[in-house]
Design a protein with these regions (language model features):
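N-terminal intrinsically disordered, cationic/polar leader segments
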Residues: 1-19, 25-26, 39-45, 50-56
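Short, charged, amphipathic alpha-helical segments
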Residues: 32-37
Length: 56
């Protein structure tokens, strides 16, 4: 996966995370779970991004 694609995926998941975190603040527990899942995916993508950026 290219650095550009990884950056786009991270940005998209970050937007989802922010939206779900706001919903969780309003008491939506399902949104809290989605936010936690998104944060895990972001962490994995950040590791891949770091490797890809060093290889580029």
């Amino acid at each position: 996966m290219s650095v550009k694609q990884l950056a786009d995926d991270i940005a998209s998941l970050s937007n989802d995370l922010v939206g779900d975190a706001e919903k969780q603040g309003s008491g939506n527990q399902a949104a809290g779970r989605r936010a936690r899942v998104a944060s895990g995916k972001i962490a994995k993508l950040c590791k891949e991004f770091r490797k890809a950026s060093l290889a580029a």
